[in-house]
Amino acid sequence: MSLSSLPGSFSSSSHPLVPYGWDADWEAEFAPYDSEGLLAGRVIRVDRGQCDVVTPGGMLRADTAFVTPHDPMRVVCTGDWVAVEPAGDPRYVRTYLPRRSAFVRSTSSKRSEGQILAANVDYAVVAVSLAVELDLGRVERFLALAWESGAQPVVVLTKADLVPDATTLSYLVQDVETAAPGVPVLSVSSNLGEGLDVLAAVLSGGTSVLLGQSGAGKSTLANALLGEDVMKVHATRDVDGKGRHTTTTRNLLALPGGGVLIDTPGLRGVGLWDAETGVNQVFSEIEALAAECRFHDCAHTAEPGCAVLAALDTGELPERRLDSYRKLLRENQRIVAKTDARLRAEIRRDWKRKGAEGKAAMEAKRGQWG
């Protein structure tokens, strides 16, 4: 049975895939495969050459052998929309639809290949534990990748109930806001249920990926948002707030208030992958200052008329911010030097085109971010 012949095509909000992010644009993209009798579905989980896919008829298991190229940037991942064979043993994923966005980090290989953690994401939720000392540099690193993905970053400060008083919590939020210009910063306590309604409202109607290092409280937060204990939770060490990987695979789950959530394993290593635009977005105040420098190619080291150094001298720009900016730019330049520029440009063009279309669709449904 073709997708368009199912009762309640996309024009009806009762379409089985709407809760997982299906919309008119995805339906149009899928039309050629629909005419071939293939099933539309969204990848819920990928595991060793197979994936779980939610389709109009329910959940099924499919083999990814036909869509497993040598390029790790083009393999099927959680969040992809795919065309699946309607029957067979095994049944195969035949292709995936062009991605609107993708969250990518570099691998530890000498070739510095990119690793896709999640696809077609609207919000990148960076979970930061308040049970340990804030690492603003790590927050900035996550945000650079989030901005580069095409998603809207959101920082969620978890375990707020462990902060001794409201004044201290306010200062911590302000510190993170300074490191995250243009990014909503929310504090929550999954144990007490505080702040969850606000976060759920933000994430409703879109696809969100939940990111953070081990021990950040991601699985506890995911369970609180889902309203049930879906993700396993392990205890963290009091001394450093770290714990074992609770989530070992990337899972996509429908939220009760609307939207879907992709939970990822705790990330100990978060390398940049062609994220210059994202870095510039995180440090937008430095980019604005750089535009005022006397020389267009100013390196902000010792040049006369450097607006960045002037702001550093007056205290307008914290030295920590400038150091972090330089560090991330240097790292990104090393990664870029090792990778195929033509391939990167091709992938980025495709994502930006689809991302613009996806953002327009989201704004039409929900209105722009307030």
Swiss-Prot record:
Cofactor, free-text remark: Binds 1 zinc ion per subunit.
Question: What cofactor does this chain's UniProt record say it requires?
Answer: Zn(2+)
Q: Which UniProt keywords apply?
A: Cytoplasm, GTP-binding, Hydrolase, Metal-binding, Nucleotide-binding, Ribosome biogenesis, RNA-binding, rRNA-binding, Zinc
Q: What is its EC number?
A: 3.6.1.-
The residues the record assigns to binding GTP are T158, K159, A160, D161, G212, Q213, S214, G215, A216, G217, K218, S219, T220
Binding residues for Zn(2+): C293, C298, H300, C306
Q: Name one GO biological process term.
A: ribosomal small subunit biogenesis
Q: Which species expresses this protein natively?
A: Streptomyces avermitilis (strain ATCC 31267 / DSM 46492 / JCM 5070 / NBRC 14893 / NCIMB 12804 / NRRL 8165 / MA-4680)
Q: Which InterPro entries does the record cross-reference, listed alphabetically?
A: G_CP_dom (IPR030378), P-loop_NTPase (IPR027417), Ribosome_biogen_GTPase_RsgA (IPR004881), RsgA_GTPase_dom (IPR010914)
Which family would the database say this protein is a member of? Belongs to the TRAFAC class YlqF/YawG GTPase family. RsgA subfamily.
Q: What is its main location?
A: cytoplasm
Q: Which residues form a coiled coil?
A: none
Protein name listed in UniProt:
Small ribosomal subunit biogenesis GTPase RsgA
Subunit-structure text: Monomer. Associates with 30S ribosomal subunit, binds 16S rRNA.
